[in-house]
Amino acid sequence: MHSTLSRLLVLLILLVSMGCEDEKTNETDNNLPESGTIHGAITFNGTWPETGQVLITLDTNYPPQGPPSGFEYLTAEGLTDGEYNYSFSNLSFRSYAAISVTYWPEGYPNGSYNSLGGNFQDMDITQDDPEMEINFSANFE
């Protein structure tokens, strides 16, 4: 009987101590973002090419040095009234130097390319400011 009573007492103490909170935390501290997003719309001017590839890239340096932080192949089917909505998500908190749109007549990464447009100003993604909208134009002319 003494052993059973001791076990119940220890179990009760454990349950009570685990159920008590030491201190309340601010709810916003628990909801801090873990990554950032850069998104926006590209307005295309001119005629979309019938061959080759159009590519959007996000780079930490400009001119680019090494692989991009993000990229996407763009297609004419993705356009709505001459606009293409893009999004780079799950980004590390840091500064990004450029979003660029390029046209590769012979397909990426072969041959030469034409720069169609972009945003070439620093974009700082931080935990306090994790989302940024960047809209710009790209020209096929």
Model-derived features: positions:
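Bacterial N-terminal signal peptides that target proteins for export
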Residues: 1-9
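C-terminal motif of bacterial Sec signal peptides marking the signal peptidase cleavage site
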Residues: 16-19
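A short, solvent-exposed beta-strand micro-motif common in secreted/extracellular proteins
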Residues: 84, 88, 92-110
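Structured interaction patches on ligand/partner-binding surfaces of diverse proteins
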Residues: 22-23, 103-141
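Short, ordered, surface-exposed loop/turn motifs in non-cytosolic proteins
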Residues: 46-70
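A short, amphipathic beta-strand motif
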Residues: 36-44, 56
